[in-house]
């Protein structure tokens, strides 16, 4: 397996969970990425509406200190498609996601 050290590029990763779940489902990914030196944030979406989930994700993106990879699982894919227009977003990753 090839790994990239964080001094070669983007250091921030934001993880967005799907519906009928919460951010705890990302714990293994969080542990793996932080062990490799990435700064990882897990969004805790309220799942009250699409707009509320996008707003929660945008608030997390506002706090990032540079280019960020935004990752969405399932319903989180729909959320990151909208939030992906944020100036800090360098790329989107869809994991079994809806667009």
Where are these regions (language model features)?
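Active-site catalytic motif of lipid deacylating hydrolases and related acyltransferases
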Residues: 6-66
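Conserved hydrolase catalytic core segment
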Residues: 66-99
